[in-house]
């Protein structure tokens, strides 16, 4: 969202002026720009979402990913039984369609998550030829990832497409003291896993 009040409530502090500066620098360096938006944030109305989508129109982007809020079991929102605002999915869908068509963005991947709002699907849109291969590989679990930091997940996969994918996971503790205590052991396990 570009709604600074909602971001503050979520402890996500945002400075649009700084964002625009970094965006302009990335544009100058010919980076492929992706924006990810989450629909269904606490206290976000249909009008808030539509305003955010109107703001997105002002940026020259190659990728847009629309996520629907999924409540993770360990999150405060899940524990507190968060109930999302009633939002007009039809209006939002119309706006997304208008923006993606205007910008020449076409859907190239979709997935669902547990505990997501009724709309439920996450869709990645892209200009042709600028699709994020990383996103596709992560969703397909055909890409190994090395997770660093509290709560990060390392996934090691054989990357097989024509056979059963083998996947091993190592999850870092979220709690800081447990993370620090177990950091060396988990790091060694990850290195061993990637040396296979």
Would you name each region that the model predicts?
Residues 1-95:
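Conserved non-cysteine loop/helix-boundary elements of the Radical SAM core domain that shape
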Residues 5-9, 98, 178-181, 185:
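Charged/polar, solvent-exposed surface patches and flexible loops
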Residues 16-22, 43-48, 76-85, 111-120, ...:
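Short secondary-structure transition/capping segments
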Residues 29, 35, 108-110, 183:
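Detector for methionine-enriched segments
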Residues 70, 74, 78-148:
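A C-terminal junction/extension of Radical SAM enzymes
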Residues 124-196:
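Radical SAM enzyme core and accessory elements
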